[in-house]
Amino acid sequence: MSEEKKDNPYGTPSTTGPEQPGESQERTNRIVRTLLRVPGLSKLVGKRLMTLHVVGRKTGRTFDIPVAYTKHGSVLLIGTALRPWVKNLAPGTPLTITRGGRPEQFDPLVHTAEAEVMRLFEVIARDNKQNACYNGIGFDAAGNPNKADIYQAWQQGGAVIELRPL
């Protein structure tokens, strides 16, 4: 993320930026976590959703975090803000996820550099317009993700998590 705010080189954003988690976010996450645990139903509900099982660095406690993802070649991509749980992800430390009711292990890499966030958020936005909207990314008349919006998401703490299979 940028240390200092600078003008958006891509022009004026079409949104105000990523949605801030509201008070209902934890309630929504609880419901989604439950639905993703139900055999059979998890494949329907979780077509673009999975649960990350993030282990706290200091507490050792496991946090189950439902997230939207995009499959990109052999990796999975997650567009998010730098939430506190993201700090617990480190390359070389396996991350367990549950997708389609099955646990899997991945090696996480958190991208925060402008160029990588811009490139990967565009991939995510093209694949999942609802996730793009949540991250404050609009689309131009031709249906392309708005680069000014992606830049704004990065400026406001946007990051992309790349999960590589183990």
Residue positions per predicted region:
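Short, structured beta-strand-loop surface elements
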Residues: 3-16, 73, 81-166
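A short, polar/charged loop/turn motif at coil->beta-strand junctions and beta-hairpin connectors
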Residues: 43-46, 157
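A generic local structural motif
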Residues: 36-37, 64-65, 147-149
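Short beta-strand segments
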Residues: 47-81
